[in-house]
Swiss-Prot record:
This is D-alanyl carrier protein. The modification O-(pantetheine 4'-phosphoryl)serine is found at S35. Belongs to the DltC family. It comes from Lactobacillus delbrueckii subsp. bulgaricus (strain ATCC 11842 / DSM 20081 / BCRC 10696 / JCM 1002 / NBRC 13953 / NCIMB 11778 / NCTC 12712 / WDCM 00102 / Lb 14). GO terms for biological process: cell wall organization; lipoteichoic acid biosynthetic process.
Amino acid sequence: MDIQKQIVDILAEATGEDFSDNMDQELYESGIMDSMTTVQMLLTLQETFDITVPVSEFNRDDWNTPNKLVEQVKKLQDEE
């Protein structure tokens, strides 16, 4: 399964919404995600992709759309 599909599935589980047709949907300003869903999503991303997301370096602007999530996961995988 590719990263994009896995992230869409993780977001669907965390938010109850399907982003497969709208990968540029703003997650925070639209109210879809809050701090609790963010923590849940980050923990799942770390477990699924065997990456570490330093909370101190987490910037919502870098993680605020499904496409940006894909970019950040790929970036972290390259660093690991």
